[in-house]
Amino acid sequence: TDLQKNNHGYALPKIFGADIDKVNELRKAGLGLLGSIVGDNKAADSIEDTAVELSDLPNYIAEFSAMMERHGQSAIYYAHAGAGELHLRPVLNLKTKEGLHQFRNIATEVAILVKKYRGSLSGEHGDGIVRGEFLPFMIGDKNYELLKRIKKAFDPNTILNVGKIVNASKMDENLRVEAGRVEPEIATIQDFSDSLGILRAAEKCNGS
């Protein structure tokens, strides 16, 4: 293959028959595997949906990796790079003020980087709540005002998807974790020690 001829990749097996389904299932299991990280450091979702032109992806990822190194943080890279969208999740502890600070700083720097490459912050999943704050920066104030006018025309009483896309809250508001909060130790009949307790076991849920 072209990849092999150009010395790209470290494993290039040929997959046939039922093994193809196994490979696809591994890809589908990616999000669940990320959620199974034990402890308070989690693969945070905020920049996981960025997409750039495929030809720009190597440089974009190189700059992103250098940025993460400057922050002294690691990230998880997975999914469909062939579409120009390699899912990126910084591993952060959002239960600390430092983690929340890095959460915002990394997201802001990534927005600037994505715009540099004329990419999108929401290539697949949508802007929603966590990326809505950056929409004016990404598309420009005039385009954003147009979106607000369209929203007002179809939803004059603001009852549909409040705070999503337009008039979104800050990305670090209303999180389900709180920096410095003392968490109770809950006694359980079943053993959740492999997750460091039932609360952290519940935190493995990604909401999907």
Model region roles, listed by residue range:
Residues 1-79, 84-123, 127-208:
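Noncatalytic alpha-helical scaffold of FAD-dependent oxidoreductases
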